[in-house]
């Protein structure tokens, strides 16, 4: 190697070292906060959650509870999903509805009274109904029969969760502010024939907080005896989505087709 080449090579070493030092000292870009933060990760997981559920019977120490008023036989079944907080919600609902089914206290009923009156029945089932993106709908079916009664009483309660917010949605959560009167009027007009046959005027019709998302509209469910006879079951009144789009918040409205103007 010539003296001139050695000189050029030695001069290049400090320059390369300086470049490496400057490169190492440059400020690295901050990590993106949208995908790595716990809150964002939890929201993304909720949005992509596909509910899987099966009905399971709740194990009880005794399926029959007795006190001075008689005996009640319980059949309690809940939903087991891949979302723990949903499972816990329904378990606590059932425990609150029938606390005696979970108590250790139990009395022997008088044999004569049991033969004459029979045994009361209490049934609760929870079922997974449907899911639309981040909205998951379940149904609580309950049946109560008092021994000696002409018939039992049943009820179906629909529960819709916003998986992103991890909360149950009330009617007030999905409606735009101050639209209740408009919704009631639209609901009456959409079901006018049936309501008129049952002598229900627009002034008498109240919105039910028991609702679910149907195929073609928002369905309001009413308890036994409230707007119809027992024999007709629990009436359902449908508000078509085409009417609901102006009163339901966009985030809680299913994706609708674009209809051509006539």
Where are the predicted features?
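Bacterial N-terminal signal peptides that target proteins for export
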Residues: 2-13
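Compositionally biased intrinsically disordered regions enriched in Thr/Gly
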Residues: 26-262
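Repetitive helical segments and hydrophobic/amphipathic motifs
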Residues: 16-17
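C-terminal motif of bacterial Sec signal peptides marking the signal peptidase cleavage site
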Residues: 21-24
């Amino acid at each position: 190697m010539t003296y001139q080449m050695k000189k050029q090579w030695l001069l290049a070493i400090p320059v390369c070292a300086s470049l490496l030092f400057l490169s190492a000292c440059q400020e690295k870009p901050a990590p993106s906060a949208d995908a790595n933060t716990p809150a964002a990760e939890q929201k993304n997981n909720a949005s992509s959650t596909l509910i899987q559920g099966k009905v399971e019977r709740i194990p009880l120490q005794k399926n029959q509870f007795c006190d001075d008023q008689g005996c009640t036989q319980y059949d309690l079944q809940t939903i087991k999903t891949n979302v723990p907080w949903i499972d816990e919600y329904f378990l606590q609902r059932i425990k609150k509805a029938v606390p005696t089914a979970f108590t250790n206290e139990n009395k022997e009923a008088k044999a004569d009274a049991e033969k004459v009156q029979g045994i009361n029945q209490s049934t609760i089932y929870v079922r997974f109904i449907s899911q639309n993106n981040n909205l998951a709908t379940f149904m609580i079916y309950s049946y109560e029969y008092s021994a000696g009664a002409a018939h039992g009483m049943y009820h179906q309660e629909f529960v819709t969760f916003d998986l992103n917010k991890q909360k149950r949605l009330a009617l007030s959560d999905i409606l735009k502010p101050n639209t209740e009167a408009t919704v009631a009027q639209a609901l009456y007009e959409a079901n006018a024939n049936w309501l008129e046959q049952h002598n229900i005027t627009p002034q008498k019709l109240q919105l039910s907080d028991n609702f679910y998302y149907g195929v073609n509209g928002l369905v309001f469910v009413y308890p036994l005896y409230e707007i119809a006879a027992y024999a007709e079951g629990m009436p359902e009144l449908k508000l078509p989505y085409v009417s609901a789009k102006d009163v339901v918040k966009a985030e809680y409205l299913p994706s609708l087709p674009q209809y051509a103007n006539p």
